Every structure is written in structure tokens, then in C-alpha cells.
Amino acid sequence: MQLFLPETVLFSYYVPNWIQALQWVDLGALGVAILAFAVFLLLMVLFPKVGAIAWVTFKEAVMQPLFIILILFGLFALFFFLFIPYHTLGDDIKLVITQGLTLIKLIAVFLAIWTASNSIADELEGKTALMILAKPVGRRKFLIGKYFGVIMAVILMFFILGLFFLNSISYKVVFDARESAKDAPTVLECLHQMKITLPGLLLSFLETMVMAAIAVAISTRLSLLPNLTLCLTVLAVGYLAPVILEASIGQNPLVAFVARFASTIFPVLAHFNMETSIATGQFLPNLYLFWATCYALLYCTLATTVGLLLFEDRDLA
């Protein structure tokens, strides 16, 4: 009697190169999520009152409909950017990276301003903050907790939009090659474009941190509309400050003084711009990212200190 064993069937499937390149992105995203969670736990352990205020502010920001609307709008726009014909003779991906970084940054800045105004200015005007400050919670802990809550909401937005953006960049490499009738790009080519994009996400996040600190400081005195107007002014002057300073060389002493004063008081947001690196296809050096991080942290500390001074003198009664 013969026994017939069933044949073993091996199923093979093809994984596109742009998807294979994303395994490194997934590992990096997991690392960022673990790091952010560890920092939050450390904040809750070392400063429980600040952590509690930050957590409440974060939940309020995430649960509001505006957060969902901004996320959906960002995802749709990033997806739409992939299929726009830019007619750049093979450099479409550079424009996609630039537009995507600008979009994510502007959406995150708007979220930071909106959240700061809702969680600080509205609570101060509605006397809701008195219930918190009546407890053994100082004004410094209240304001710092609000700032960390805003940053936590910004981190979540950057995590969602940034992860989708890196996925779209990896696919854009394959899409452009297919449209140009070129050979299919390798995994390394897809990974190369994502590596160029990563420093841009970091710099955009640092810029959003600076603008969030300014928005929190302004929210101690002004409501949403004046806050939004002033923050947009700071954003514009921050990018134009180097140009104004360079143009003032050899001009009237008063013009030169105003230019130097503006470049000193306002944040030089051009430090967080990497369009030159994108245009040349080069990586930003780690030393530049280090000093940009130091500059952002220094200015955030300065803006928060100014906010504390403004908040200490405000009458809440």
C-alpha cells in the first residue's frame, strides 16, 4: 500500500521596492513613538502637575474637530501632490518634498496657534483658569504645562502626516520612473529620497516649536485673532530678516538699526529652511541639525520666559 503525501506548494509574492524601503521608516517611527512616550512618562514622574495639565491640553486639542479636519486635509493634499505634473524634467520629486514640508509646517503652526488660544486665552477670559490656579498650581506650571500639551498635539500631527509623507515620497520615486519610461528604481534609491526628507521634517518641527512658544506667550494677553495676526507677522519677518539685514548694508543708519533689531528680536526662521539642500540633493550635516536644535530650544526658552512675565502681571479676577 502506497502513501501519497500532499505536495508542498510555495506561494511567492512580489513586494515593490518602494514598500521594501519603508521597513526602515516603520522602525524609525516606532523609535520616535517610544521616545515621545518615554519623555511624557518622565514628565509625569518628575513634574506630575505639569504633566497633568499637558495631558488635558493634549486631549482637548486632539478631540476638537479642527484636528481631524487638518489631518484629513493634509493627507489629501500630500496624496494630491504626487500626481501634479510639474514639468521639471525629472526633478518633480524635489518640488513634492518642498511643498509637502511647507504644508505640514503651516498646518502644524495653525494647530499650535489655535490650541494655545483655546486652552489659554479662552480659559483666562472665561475665568476657567481660576479653578486650576486656585489649587496648589502656580502660574509657571500652568503655562509650561499648556505649552507641553500643545507640543504633544503637534508631535502627533507630525507623526501622522510625516509618516504618510515619507510613504508618498518613496512611491513618488517609482511613479516618476514609470512616467519617464525608466528602469524601476531600487530600494536604495527610494530610501535615499526619504533620507533627504527626514532632516526637513525635523527642521519643520523645530520651527513649529518656536512658533508654538510664541503663540503661547501671546495667548496670555490676546485672543485668537490678534494671536494669529501677530504669529503670521513673526513668521513673515522671520523669513525676511536675513534678506532685510543684507539689503540694509550701506543704507541709512536708521534702516540698518531697524534691520539688526528685527533680526535680533524675531526668530531667524531661515535657519529651518532646507530648500537649498533639496535642490542640490545633498544631505544636511548633523552639526547643522545640532545647532538648529540648540537655537530652537534657546528661542523656545526665551519666548516661554517672556510669556511667564506677561502672565505673572495679568489680573485674573
Regions inferred by a protein language model and the residue ranges of each:
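Secretory targeting signals
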Residues: 22-46, 79-119, 143-224, 247-250, ...
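Membrane-interfacial helix-loop-helix junctions in multi-pass membrane proteins
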Residues: 14-21, 265-295
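Short, strongly hydrophobic alpha-helical membrane anchors
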Residues: 1-23
